[in-house]
Amino acid sequence: AKAPWILSKNIAKIMPKNSRIINITSPGSSKVLKNYFSVGVSKAALESLTRYMAVDLAPKGINVNSISPSLVETDALKYFPNQEDIKSILERKNPKEKKLTPDDIAEVAVLLCQEKSNMIVGQNIIIDGGENLVLR
């Protein structure tokens, strides 16, 4: 979380009012996932950083939030060592019965950049079709 902190701290100095900073985290920030220790801890720190920066930058007219998407089937997943675990997560059904896509994440980012979202401050938006609501 150090790089996003340094970048955000410095770029905020020149950002105009009504600007946005959106961090991308993951469910591994609050749930323990196999082979995800370093990333999970970093994502948890990034969510905390999001809240602290949101309070610090809100008076300057800069909104800071984070987005926490579930797994998305992309080429990046082939670099994870636990392919069977990844496959089972991707095959799980969420209440929407739909796989998450990059477009789903982009739409939330666009929403957070719009003026109508100006009172959403310091929040972590979970995008998973309700998957985290269902006990497994």
Question: What do the PLM-derived regions correspond to, one by one?
Answer:
Residues 8, 42, 50:
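Active-site helix of classical SDR
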Residues 32-40, 52:
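Active-site loop-to-helix junction immediately N-terminal to the catalytic Tyr of the SDR YXXXK motif
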Residues 94-105:
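A conserved structural motif in NAD(P)-dependent oxidoreductases
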Residues 26:
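Residue(s) in the substrate-gating loop at a strand-loop-helix junction
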Residues 31, 110, 121-136:
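Short C-terminal tail/terminal secondary-structure segment
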